[in-house]
């Protein structure tokens, strides 16, 4: 059995921290496990970078590429020490070698945490402040500062590690890193950042989840209340009480044609006609492509006949709900104000129910459930090694059995960072593609649609319409 304790040797070697009591074979297996995990992380990082490289023009994808680039370099650095120590069961690293590997590993670990936080902060700003300019939302205006701080902050933390002049970085047999004692260096330069980032990420994701839920509920309430749909849109102040107060509804198709046929010599657009106090310039405000005269509302609707037609045959966005209203006519005179108002509201309500925006918001609501996937992964990666260290420090020299197996899992999780993040991205992309194919109205087979989406992704166009 090998007892890894604190032993201060000559100046040419670094001290080894007391981790667990392992045999030669267990130590070799532990190093092999770290090498395999780091190698897989390298592959997944390259796949993630290649996957997003075609969309690198957007600032969000640039942040993701920066994150996986750091993970790629970090995985390479993590492989160096166990590869050098694999042939020697009890490897004593020269001080300059362990200091170099430990310094760059600490810098890359902190840089990884920084880019994780930047990605989540950028997404949170996009969700919480959607009314800002589309091209300059999130952290776009501060992108140069963000990239500069990604080097300044980690390098500063790495430099602070040298304040521990006795054991700056120690040989932990699977890596060269900060010593476990004195605890202030491990807590100040490692644990404190993990705890702060965990709390900040959970807070941001919770705010995003609550904001999305509130917007979806508000939209559902608005779309289901057909009788109050005009009040919600701020189109009219109250319902009409007389036939001459009925205003034409703002139908959602901007390609529709309007035809007016006056029944007498007096034009309904005459300057002598006084608009109703209940009417507003509906059509021009909602549809700027309509003629200017259509925004006036006649006051003598009983005397003037109106022939109102809408033709949706040339509209590319026609839905099933709009097919029932392709020929909508109002003849003069109106029999009752209730019939006129109810027909207007019913037509508009059916159009709103079949609005593709409603389906889009339902899809966003279902996707919002995945917001906590990233915090769960980060907490899993950060908490396990910390619990392992706490248990070992509480029971020194007695970590065996289940404690040893837990320590192996903690070491595995600590070296599997890129795999966890890449798998989360891959699952998310598959889910988004599945919902896109499921809700898409197409006569093509699933296989043809998958090939079409793959071609879009290869050209960097998939997701732009989202």
Swiss-Prot record:
<comment type="subunit">
    <text>Interacts with G protein alpha subunit gpa2; the interaction is direct and leads to activation of gpa2 upon glucose stimulation.</text>
</comment>
<comment type="function">
    <text>G protein-coupled receptor (GPCR) that senses glucose and signals via the heterotrimeric G protein alpha subunit gpa2 to activate adenylate cyclase and PKA signaling, and suppress sexual development and gluconeogenesis.</text>
</comment>
<keyword id="KW-0297">G-protein coupled receptor</keyword>
<feature type="transmembrane region" description="Helical; Name=3">
    <location>
        <begin position="101"/>
        <end position="121"/>
    </location>
</feature>
<feature type="transmembrane region" description="Helical; Name=4">
    <location>
        <begin position="144"/>
        <end position="164"/>
    </location>
</feature>
<dbReference type="GO" id="GO:0010619">
    <property type="term" value="P:adenylate cyclase-activating glucose-activated G protein-coupled receptor signaling pathway"/>
</dbReference>
<keyword id="KW-0807">Transducer</keyword>
<comment type="similarity">
    <text>Belongs to the G-protein coupled receptor GPR1/git3 family.</text>
</comment>
<dbReference type="GO" id="GO:1990576">
    <property type="term" value="F:G protein-coupled glucose receptor activity"/>
</dbReference>
<keyword id="KW-1133">Transmembrane helix</keyword>
<dbReference type="GO" id="GO:0007189">
    <property type="term" value="P:adenylate cyclase-activating G protein-coupled receptor signaling pathway"/>
</dbReference>
<feature type="compositionally biased region" description="Polar residues">
    <location>
        <begin position="292"/>
        <end position="305"/>
    </location>
</feature>
<feature type="compositionally biased region" description="Basic and acidic residues">
    <location>
        <begin position="308"/>
        <end position="327"/>
    </location>
</feature>
<keyword id="KW-0472">Membrane</keyword>
<feature type="region of interest" description="Disordered">
    <location>
        <begin position="262"/>
        <end position="337"/>
    </location>
</feature>
<feature type="transmembrane region" description="Helical; Name=7">
    <location>
        <begin position="409"/>
        <end position="429"/>
    </location>
</feature>
<dbReference type="GO" id="GO:0005085">
    <property type="term" value="F:guanyl-nucleotide exchange factor activity"/>
</dbReference>
<feature type="transmembrane region" description="Helical; Name=5">
    <location>
        <begin position="192"/>
        <end position="212"/>
    </location>
</feature>
<keyword id="KW-0675">Receptor</keyword>
<dbReference type="GO" id="GO:0005886">
    <property type="term" value="C:plasma membrane"/>
</dbReference>
<dbReference type="GO" id="GO:0010515">
    <property type="term" value="P:negative regulation of induction of conjugation with cellular fusion"/>
</dbReference>
<keyword id="KW-0812">Transmembrane</keyword>
<feature type="transmembrane region" description="Helical; Name=2">
    <location>
        <begin position="65"/>
        <end position="85"/>
    </location>
</feature>
<dbReference type="InterPro" id="IPR023041">
    <property type="entry name" value="Glucose_rcpt_Git3_N"/>
</dbReference>
<feature type="transmembrane region" description="Helical; Name=6">
    <location>
        <begin position="372"/>
        <end position="392"/>
    </location>
</feature>
<dbReference type="GO" id="GO:0004930">
    <property type="term" value="F:G protein-coupled receptor activity"/>
</dbReference>
<protein>
    <recommendedName>
        <fullName>Glucose receptor protein git3</fullName>
    </recommendedName>
</protein>
<feature type="transmembrane region" description="Helical; Name=1">
    <location>
        <begin position="30"/>
        <end position="50"/>
    </location>
</feature>
<feature type="compositionally biased region" description="Low complexity">
    <location>
        <begin position="262"/>
        <end position="285"/>
    </location>
</feature>
<dbReference type="Pfam" id="PF11710">
    <property type="entry name" value="Git3"/>
</dbReference>
